From Swiss-Prot:
Belongs to the tetrahydrofolate dehydrogenase/cyclohydrolase family. This is Bifunctional protein FolD 1. The lineage of its organism: Bacteria, Pseudomonadati, Pseudomonadota, Gammaproteobacteria, Thiotrichales. NADP(+) binds at residues 166-168, 191, 232. Homodimer. Its EC number is 1.5.1.5, 3.5.4.9.
Length: 284
């Protein structure tokens, strides 16, 4: 058996097209285009690529791009002041600070300073709390993008045994909450989990986001399982791979996300969707 591919790239393009049409309709009715401020502190090469991709996506969707690059030596106080300014601007509907930030910056304080109604990354404790109480507003982009991809593909989640490998606030924890809200039975695995291969082998659905190349071996995967690989890692030869051993896993799974072209495009599309919602109170 060879798995069917969960084509995040195609689903994301469909979603972005709907977002663009909604923006055109709102602007035609006299509304301002959605404004997204992406703040990059320093010159981390990977972050520069992510910010560039977000900028291109904004422009294609008809958004007002308010991206800015601040020097690496920017102080905590200076960054907080910039966020305060953006919080008050009525042409800015979404604010994100590209992570990671330099070591002298406290990311938790920065995230909490963003107006929760403009927190389109969904990382503010207010938005995480809304998700945890089944009242989501702006949900973290990667997990919500995964949920959109599964829904658009018609994969039912109710009653499935789901294993989330990784417990970060960016992916693992909100992913578990999203799955729980769809009535899956969820196990979260992390660095202290015992017998990870056995946990994975019992899963109908596996979501992996740890940032370690090929950490989850293909032969751990249960026959017919759904595999969502959130990881994207660059190897020494320049090639990209996920956190799951893809070539082996795809022979056992029923559905699997490729890397690249799986979860990544859905993350950016969901960021646009969150910004649209913050601007107009509607979803595409």
């Amino acid at each position: 058996m060879s798995a069917q591919i969960l084509d995040g790239k195609a689903i994301a393009l469909e979603l972005r097209d709907s977002i663009q049409k909604e923006v055109e309709a709102q602007v035609a009715n006299g509304k301002k285009p959605p404004g997204l401020a992406v703040i990059l502190v320093g010159e981390d090469p990977a972050s520069q690529v992510y910010v560039k991709n977000k900028k291109i996506a904004c422009e294609k969707a008809g958004f007002n791009d308010v991206s800015m690059v601040l020097p690496a030596e920017t102080s905590q106080a200076e960054l907080l002041a910039k966020i305060d300014e953006l919080n008050t601007r009525d042409d800015v509907h979404g604010i994100i600070v590209q992570l990671p930030v330099p070591d002298h910056i406290d990311p938790e304080e920065i995230i909490e300073r963003i107006d929760p109604k403009k927190d389109v990354d969904g990382f503010h404790p207010y938005n995480m709390g809304r998700l945890a109480t089944r009242l989501p507003e702006l949900a973290p982009c990667t997990p919500h993008g995964v949920m959109t991809m599964l829904a658009k593909t018609g994969i039912p989640l109710r009653g499935l045994n789901a294993v989330v490998v990784g417990a970060s606030n960016i992916v693992g924890v909100p992913m578990a909450l999203e799955l729980l809200n769809e009535r899956a039975t969820v196990t979260v695995c992390h660095s202290a989990t015992k017998d990870l291969p056995q946990k994975v082998a019992e899963a109908d659905l596996v979501v992996v986001g740890v940032g370690i190349p090929n950490m989850v071996k293909g032969d751990w995967i249960k026959d017919g399982a759904i595999v969502i690989d959130v990881g994207i890692n660059r190897l020494d030869d320049g090639s990209l791979c996920g956190d799951v051993e893809y070539d082996v896993a795809k022979e056992k799974a029923s559905w699997i996300t490729p890397v690249p072209g799986g979860v990544g495009p859905m993350t950016i599309a969901t960021l646009l969707q969150n910004t649209l919602q913050a601007a107009y109170g509607v979803k595409a």
